[in-house]
Amino acid sequence: MSHPTTHEFSQYAEVLAALSDPALVPPPPVPVEGPPGASVAWLRGSVARFASGEAHRRRRALVEAELARLAPADVHRAASGADTRSDPRTRVVRGLAAALHMPEPERVAREVGAVADAYFGEDGGPGADRAVARLVALLAPGVVDDTGLEAVANRIGLLVQACAATAALVEAAGDGVPTARVLRDDPPVRVMRRTAARATRVAGREIAEGDEVVLDLGAAQQGHAAPLAFGAPPRACPGRAHALALAEGLLGRPMTPFARLHHQGKALLLPNAWDYASAAALAAEGFEAVGTTSLGVAAGLGLPDGAAATKEATVELAGRLGRGPFLFSVDAEGGFSDNPAEVALLARRLYEAGAAGINLEDGRADGTLAPVELHAAKIAAVKEAVPGLFVNARTDTYWLGIAPERTAGRLAVYERAGADGVFVPGLSDRAGIAALTAALVTPLNVLYSPAGPGIAELGALGVRRVSLGSLLYREALAGAVSTAAAIRDGGPVRGGALPYADVQALAPGDG
């Protein structure tokens, strides 16, 4: 009888191909019998991680449904303020259990800690089996049917899998290191193992049924944009955003109200204003936050957009918007300087004026892109100077039609520099959006396109912010001109204008 062959892969393309191959699955659980609901053997045999085919799809759906009830921002909130003296693994599980509203999170964390090592293949002994039984009794008291037990098994599996990997991320991201940098430079999961459920072929290599595959994520990751620590479809980790929010919360990194809007599990629609009245009117309509449009600011002054000519006007607008009871982010073009220190100073002025976020673009007025290292230096300088300001790093690869294939690579550098979100105007095709969200660690912002997907579909594709850019300003100009022309030509005037008193009421009233 021949023994299984072990295949090792360390090149990025090979590892990604292996992760994406449905024939390669995590090593199946050791075929040891264990009582249902009361043993590690039962747990391993009941979770999505070690299943394939229909069982994997069914169990993965249970995990996805569990996570769908929980916005990443809620995970961050539950993890914030945790006792930093306890073991990182305990803190991770306690925070996630609390966010999922499980009873006695502290006890859940202790029991999961006792299960974790045995779950991943080490001998946990009878103590680990007893911990499984206690968890089942705590999380699903009285449940004995197969369907109910499978559901609770996958709840426990979710906690166990978060235990080690997220704790490693927390430890590696200490001292202010962006988690995006850790995931690419020092991934918490450095090696993954797979078993061939059936014969397949990866990177020109024949893999027989039963062969073992070892994937060196640490080596493969170097120099590549998309982090591999969360796997790839069809087994991509469904809790990536939750794990990152959990880590940030445990690290004590605050999530501002504006940042929280990007971590709600859906797309934030951010309309763009050009003066106080337009911003206040949008806020009065119920929009949770507004952005500014650099075109609207520049055009209102008779200046070209993107020419770094509106620095002081932008700061003045921020000062006016800061008087209002709404969150706002400022479009600051490229920071109005190629000196990172000057950009950081501008960011501080905007923050002190009341801005919750800043948009920094790498496109230049001459139609070229700024060097990626320069733009990253601006981002890093701003985050160091004003940690509480949400930095939305924009790349104009699609907008200017310059090397769109390098988009993910540029954004990876910006994420590593500390960007809180990334913006790709001009990207509107569904496949491109889905591929990019899979490569990112931070929330993706796109520009709304009337010909592209709607807000709900963009959210389903993984987009977390949708900007309207200059659309509203251009619509307002068109409306003003068409109304004047209709009156001149004796035609009908379109109704719907705001009453004079309503516009007056938008003013903050403090001079």
Locations of regions flagged by a protein language model:
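Active-site substrate-recognition loop segments, prototypically the cytochrome P450 B′-helix/B-C loop
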Residues: 1-86, 93-103, 237
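Conserved cytochrome P450 K-helix E-x-x-R motif and the immediately C-terminal K′/meander segment
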Residues: 140-146, 176-219
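Cytochrome P450 catalytic-core helices
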Residues: 153-179, 238-254
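Cytochrome P450 heme-binding Cys-pocket and its upstream "meander" loop
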Residues: 216-245
